[in-house]
Design a protein with these regions (language model features):
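Aromatic-rich, lipid-facing transmembrane alpha helices and their immediate juxtamembrane interface loops
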Residues: 1-171
C-alpha cells in the first residue's frame, strides 16, 4: 500500500508540475510536490539519508536540466525570466519528488546498475516528450539529437541516484 501511495503521490504532483506552466500557473506544481514531500515524510518518517538524497538531487537535477537548456535543444515554460537560463522551480520540484521514489516504489531497482541505465535511457526521453506534449517544454533542432541527449542524461542519472542513495545509507 505504501508503494502505491508513493507512486500515486508522485504522479499527481508530476502532472501538476507539467501542466502548471502550460496554463500560466508554474508554481502549482511545486506546491503540489511540497504537499507530497510533507505527506511522504509524515507517513514514512524523516530518515536523514532520504532527506539528504532529496536535497542532493534537487540541486544536481536543477544543474542537469539547466545544462540541457543551455545546450539549446530544449526550453522550459514557467521559467524565472527570459534572460536567466536556469531550470524552473517546477523542474527542481520534480527532482525532489523523484528522489522519494528510490527507496519506495522504485526500490526494486536498487543494486541493478545496468537495468537502471537502460530504464533511464528509455523512460527519460518518454517523460520529457510527455512534458512537451503538455506544453511544459519545447524541443529545438533535430529530434534525434534531443532524444540522444535525454537518453544519455537519464541513462546516467538513474544509476547515479541509486549509487548516491547507497552511499548515504551506509553512513
Amino acid at each position: 500500500m505504501k508503494k502505491l501511495v508513493n507512486i500515486l503521490g508522485f504522479k499527481i504532483s508530476w502532472w501538476a508540475c507539467v501542466v502548471g506552466p502550460s496554463i500560466d500557473m508554474p508554481y502549482i506544481g511545486p506546491a503540489a510536490m511540497l504537499i507530497f514531500l510533507l505527506a511522504h515524510f509524515s507517513f514514512n518518517g524523516m530518515e536523514s539519508s532520504e532527506i539528504k538524497l532529496v536535497i542532493i538531487f534537487s540541486i544536481l537535477g536543477t544543474v542537469i536540466d539547466t545544462l540541457m537548456a543551455l545546450s539549446g535543444l530544449l526550453t522550459y515554460n514557467g521559467t524565472y525570466s527570459n534572460e536567466i537560463v536556469v531550470a524552473p522551480l517546477w523542474i527542481t520540484a520534480m527532482w525532489c519528488g523523484f528522489a522519494l521514489l528510490v527507496n519506495h516504489s522504485m526500490a526494486w531497482l536498487e543494486g541493478k546498475f545496468f537495468q537502471a541505465l537502460i530504464l533511464g535511457a528509455v523512460i527519460g526521453p518518454i517523460a520529457y516528450k510527455a512534458g512537451e506534449g503538455l506544453g511544459a517544454i519545447s524541443f529545438h533542432g533535430n529530434m534525434l539529437h534531443v532524444t540522444m541527449m535525454l537518453s544519455i542524461v537519464w541513462g546516467l542519472s538513474l544509476p547515479l541516484i541509486y549509487w548516491v542513495n547507497d552511499r548515504l545509507k551506509q553512513r
